[in-house]
Structure formats: C-alpha cells, structure tokens
Amino acid sequence: MTMHAALDAFRRPREQHEALIEIAGLEEGRIILAREGDKIVGYVTFHYPDELERWSEGGMPDLIELGAIEVADEYRGYGIGKRMIQLAFAEGQLENMIVFTTEYYWHWDLEGTKLTVWDYRKMMEKLMKSVGMVWFATDDPEICSHPANCLMVRIGQEVPLSSVEQFDRVRFRQRFMY
C-alpha cells in the first residue's frame, strides 16, 4: 500500500506510512484506514501517549491517544473521517479507555479548507463529538499557547473512578484541587 501524496499534515507521506507501520506494531496500536485500491486516502491512529509528553506521566494503561486523523484533500466532504472515527468506537471497543486528543491549530489545513481557525476548531469539535468526545480543561502549556488549541476527551463507561482521578492530576499540574 502507498500513501496519498496529500496526506502530509503531520509529516511527509512516506514518513507517515512508516509511522503507521510502527503504530500497527505496538501492542495498543490501532489504525483505521480509508483506501482506494492500494492507496491510503485517510487514517485514524490510536496509541499510548508519547513518553516525553505529560499525558504519559500517570502511567495509565487505560489512557490512549487518538493521535491523528487525516483525509486526503480530494476525499474530504464525504464523511470519511467521521466514518473512520465512528468505526474505531463501534460496539463498545473503547469503553474501558479514556481516549484523548490534543488539537493544535498548527496541524490544521486552514489554507486548503479556507476555514478560519475558529471554524476549523468547530469542525473538529463536531467530528469528535460524533463519538462522545468533549472539550476538557487543562493547564498544558502547549494547549494553552493558543486559544483555538484544545483537549478533547471521552471517558468510557467501564473506566474506574481512580483512573478518572489520575487523569485529572495529569491534566492539571498547577492545581492542588480541581
């Protein structure tokens, strides 16, 4: 399989293909692909948080990151992204997990979509809400560096309260109470 040339929001297509292979090799790694023939035209990835990021600090086996969602330009507008993300959450597959995604405006295709940063954020929030993900507050400096950046989270119905509390401690480093 090859990557569509327009799948370059996070890295060059060949490098992104290598990253997908690496994620597929992770025990917790999950990838949903959209393809036409042998060409990948969209993908969604799930994996544990990078060990260099704050989200890994809690050492939580039930915390997984929706790391990326991308659809090639010419395939946008057909609901492919929404269908991929809904498939990932179908049939209670992630009810035992806290799933989070960090939305940073610098990864968004503002130029290609001709959307403002706020309209793009609304579009991303709508997409994430289609699987029950909602905005969560955090004091993470990268997220707080721009008001359009955000943390979206879905807490599965089978996640224990102790994990939710641990996630809250990771979300807020600067608070003693929340």
Go through each PLM region and give its residues:
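Short amphipathic alpha-helical segments and helix-helix/interface helices
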Residues: 20-22, 85, 125
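Hydrophobic, well-ordered secondary-structure scaffolds
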Residues: 65-66, 87-92, 101
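A conserved beta-strand-loop-helix scaffold within acyl/acetyltransferase catalytic domains
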Residues: 11-36, 41-64, 69
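A generic structural signal for short coil/turn motifs at secondary-structure boundaries
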Residues: 53-56, 75, 109-112
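Conserved acetyl-CoA-binding loop-helix of GNAT-fold acetyltransferases
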Residues: 71, 77-93
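Terminal substrate-recognition subdomain of acyl/acetyltransferases
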Residues: 1-11, 97-178
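Surface-exposed cleft-lining segments at the edges of enzyme active sites
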Residues: 4-8, 65, 70-75
